[in-house]
C-alpha cells in the first residue's frame, strides 16, 4: 500500500514535458507545474516573443510575470529522492538466491557477493573471500575513478559529436556556395554552356550526397557512442548512490563494460583535398565552344570500309574497330611462328567516305583505350605491313595527318621527319589537361587543315595540321594498335 502511495505522489510531481521528477519546479496560474528548463524550452519553440502564452497541458493562457517557483513541490521531490527500498525488498537483495543465507562475503576471483554456503561450495573453493565491508571502499574508489574517466570520455564524445555536426553544416554551406558560383558563371553563356553546367552540377551534387551521407553515418555513430557512454555513467551513478549490495552485485560485468569503452573517431573530409570546381576563362571557353559549334555543323556519319589487308576486327554496324589477339593473326597466316607473333602487324583501316572537297567533321570514342591512332589518310589503302612501334609511315609526306595515344597518357602528333632522319616521323608531344575519351576530327579540304578537338575537355583544340597537301582523295583513318578495347565512330545524334 505504501508503495502505491509513493507511485501516486511521484505522478503528482512528475513534469508533463520531460516525464521526469520536477527540477526547479515552476507553477502557472492554472496549477500545473513544470521544470524550469522544460518550460523555458517550450517558450522558445512555441512562441519566442513576449506576451501571453498558454499552458502546455490545458492551454489556459498565462502571463510570464505570474510564473512562480513552487517550493512546496520542490521539497516533496527532494524527500521522494531520499526514499530507500522497503525492508522486504532490501531483505531480498541481501540474501543469496541459491541458499537463502545473508550475502556477507565477496569473492575476489569471481568478483561476486556470496554467502557462507557459497564460500564452502566447489564453485568458490580455494578462492580469496573477504567481508563485503572490507572490499567496498576499494571498489568504491575503482568505480569512482572509472566514473571520472567515463565523464571525460563523455565530454570528448560530445565534442566529437559537435565537431561532426559543425563540419556537416560547413559542408552544406560550402556546397551551396559553390553551386551558386557555378550558376552565376554559366549564366552569361547559357545558350552554349548548358551541357557543361549540367555536368559540373551533377558532379557537385554527387560529391554532396556522398560526403553528407558519410557524415550522416558518422553523426549517427557519434550519437550512439555518446548514448552508450551516458547509459554506462547512469548505471555507475545508480550503483554509487545505492547500498553496498547494489554497488557490488554484478560489479564484474560493469567493469568489463567499462574496459570495452573506446571512442571511435569520426571520418572527416579535409576541404583542401576535395574536388573544387575551377571555372575556365569564359572568353577562351566561349571561343572554343563557338569553334566546336561551328565545326559540328559539318558532322558526317562515318563508318569504316572492310578490306582484306588490315587485321582490324570490325563490328557488324561498321562503327567499332578493335585489335585482335596476336594468336588469331598467326592462325590466319597458317603458322604460330613466335617471330610473327612479336612482329607488329597492321590494324589501320580507312573510313568508307572518300573526301575530295568541302568541310567534314566526325567524332571517335576512345575511352578506356591505352593506345590508338586516328586522323585522315590519303590514298586508297594504308600499307599492309610496317613497324607500328616506330610509326615509320605516320608522316604527312606519306599521306597521314594523325595524332595518337600510347601508354594511356602520352598524346603525340606525327609530323614529317627531319633532314637527318627523313624516314622517321618527328614526334610532337601534346599537352592535354584531360586525357581524351572522345576526339573530334575536322577536315577542311579547301583550307588544307586537319584539326583535332578534345571533347572530354569541353572541346579544346588538341592539335592542328596546316598547309596539308591533299593531292588525292583522303579518308578517315583509325588504328586501334595493340589495344583490344574497341574505338567507336560516333553517330551525329550521339
Swiss-Prot record:
Zinc fingers, B box-type class: 91-133
Entry keyword set: Acetylation, Antiviral defense, Autophagy, Coiled coil, Cytoplasm, Immunity, Innate immunity, Metal-binding, Nucleus, Phosphoprotein, Transferase, Ubl conjugation, Ubl conjugation pathway, Zinc, Zinc-finger
Residues reported in the UniProt entry to bind Zn(2+): 96, 99, 118, 124
A GO biological-process term: activation of innate immune response
Cross-referenced CDD domains: Bbox2_TRIM5-like, RING-HC_TRIM5-like_C-IV, SPRY_PRY_TRIM5
Entry GO MF terms: pattern recognition receptor activity; ubiquitin-protein transferase activity; zinc ion binding
Positions annotated as zinc finger (RING-type): 15-59
Pfam families: SPRY, zf-B_box, zf-RING_UBOX
Keyword Hydrolase: no
Record EC number: 2.3.2.27
PTM annotation (Phosphoserine): residues: 86
SUPFAM superfamilies xrefs: B-box zinc-binding domain, Concanavalin A-like lectins/glucanases, RING/U-box
Function as written in the Swiss-Prot or TrEMBL entry: Capsid-specific restriction factor that prevents infection from non-host-adapted retroviruses. Blocks viral replication early in the life cycle, after viral entry but before reverse transcription. In addition to acting as a capsid-specific restriction factor, also acts as a pattern recognition receptor that activates innate immune signaling in response to the retroviral capsid lattice.
Database matches in PANTHER family: E3 UBIQUITIN-PROTEIN LIGASE TRIM (PTHR24103)
Subunit comment: Can form homodimers and homotrimers. In addition to lower-order dimerization, also exhibits a higher-order multimerization and both low- and high-order multimerizations are essential for its restriction activity. Interacts with BTBD1 and BTBD2. Interacts with PSMC4, PSMC5, PSMD7 and HSPA8/HSC70. Interacts (via B30.2/SPRY domain) with HSPA1A/B. Interacts with PSMC2, MAP3K7/TAK1, TAB2 and TAB3. Interacts with SQSTM1. Interacts with TRIM6 and TRIM34. Interacts with ULK1 (phosphorylated form), GABARAP, GABARAPL1, GABARAPL2, MAP1LC3A, MAP1LC3C and BECN1.
Family: Belongs to the TRIM/RBCC family.
Name the record gives this protein: Tripartite motif-containing protein 5
Amino acid at each position: 500500500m505504501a508503495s502505491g502511495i509513493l507511485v501516486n505522489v511521484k505522478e503528482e510531481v512528475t513534469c508533463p514535458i520531460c516525464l521526469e521528477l520536477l527540477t526547479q519546479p515552476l507553477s502557472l496560474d492554472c496549477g500545473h507545474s513544470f521544470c524550469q528548463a522544460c518550460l523555458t524550452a517550450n517558450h522558445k519553440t512555441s512562441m519566442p516573443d513576449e506576451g501571453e502564452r498558454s499552458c502546455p497541458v490545458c492551454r489556459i493562457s498565462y502571463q510570464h510575470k505570474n510564473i512562480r517557483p513552487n517550493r512546496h513541490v520542490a521539497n516533496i521531490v527532494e524527500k521522494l529522492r531520499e526514499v530507500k527500498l522497503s525492508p522486504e525488498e532490501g531483505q531480498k537483495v541481501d540474501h543469496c538466491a541459491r541458499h537463502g543465507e545473508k550475502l556477507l562475503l565477496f569473492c575476489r576471483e569471481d568478483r561476486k557477493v556470496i554467502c557462507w554456503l557459497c564460500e564452502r561450495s566447489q564453485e568458490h573453493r580455494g578462492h580469496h573471500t573477504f567481508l563485503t565491508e572490507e572490499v567496498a571502499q576499494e571498489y568504491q574508489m575503482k568505480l569512482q575513478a572509472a566514473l571520472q574517466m567515463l565523464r571525460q570520455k563523455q565530454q570528448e564524445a560530445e565534442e566529437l559529436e559537435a565537431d561532426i555536426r559543425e563540419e556537416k553544416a560547413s559542408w552544406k554551406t560550402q556546397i551551396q556556395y559553390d553551386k551558386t558560383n557555378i550558376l552565376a558563371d554559366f549564366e552569361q553563356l547559357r545558350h552554349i554552356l548548358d551541357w557543361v553546367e549540367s555536368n559540373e552540377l551533377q558532379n557537385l551534387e554527387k560529391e554532396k550526397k556522398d560526403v553528407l551521407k558519410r557524415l550522416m553515418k558518422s553523426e549517427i555513430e557519434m550519437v550512439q557512442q555518446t548514448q552508450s557512454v551516458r547509459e554506462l555513467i547512469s548505471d555507475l551513478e545508480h550503483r554509487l548512490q545505492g547500498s553496498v549490495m547494489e554497488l557490488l552485485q554484478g560489479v564484474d560485468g560493469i567493469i568489463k563494460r567499462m574496459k570495452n569503452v573506446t571512442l571511435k573517431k569520426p571520418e572527416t573530409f579535409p576541404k583542401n583535398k576535395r574536388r573544387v570546381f575551377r571555372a575556365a576563362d569564359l572568353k577562351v571557353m566561349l571561343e572554343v565552344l563557338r569553334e566546336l559549334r561551328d565545326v559540328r555543323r559539318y558532322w558526317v556519319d562515318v563508318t569504316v570500309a572492310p578490306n582484306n589487308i588490315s587485321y582490324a576486327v570490325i563490328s557488324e554496324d561498321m562503327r567499332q574497330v578493335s585489335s585482335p589477339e596476336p594468336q588469331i593473326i598467326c592462325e590466319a597466316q597458317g603458322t604460330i611462328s613466335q617471330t610473327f607473333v612479336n612482329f607488329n602487324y597492321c590494324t589501320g583501316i580507312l573510313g568508307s567516305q572518300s573526301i575530295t572537297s568541302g568541310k567534314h567533321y566526325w567524332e571517335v570514342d576512345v575511352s578506356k583505350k591505352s593506345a590508338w591512332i586516328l586522323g585522315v589518310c590519303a590514298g586508297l589503302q594504308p600499307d599492309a605491313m610496317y613497324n607500328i612501334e616506330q610509326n615509320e609511315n605516320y608522316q604527312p609526306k606519306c599521306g597521314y595527318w594523325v595524332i595518337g595515344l600510347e601508354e594511356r597518357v602520352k598524346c603525340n602528333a606525327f609530323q614529317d621527319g627531319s633532314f637527318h632522319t627523313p624516314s622517321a616521323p618527328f614526334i610532337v608531344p601534346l599537352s592535354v589537361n584531360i586525357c581524351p575519351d572522345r576526339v573530334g576530327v575536322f577536315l577542311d579540304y579547301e583550307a588544307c587543315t586537319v584539326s583535332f578537338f578534345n571533347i572530354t575537355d569541353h572541346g579544346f583544340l588538341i592539335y592542328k595540321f596546316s598547309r596539308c597537301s591533299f593531292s588525292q582523295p583522303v579518308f578517315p583513318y583509325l588504328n586501334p594498335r595493340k589495344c583490344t578495347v574497341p574505338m567507336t565512330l560516333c553517330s551525329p545524334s550521339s
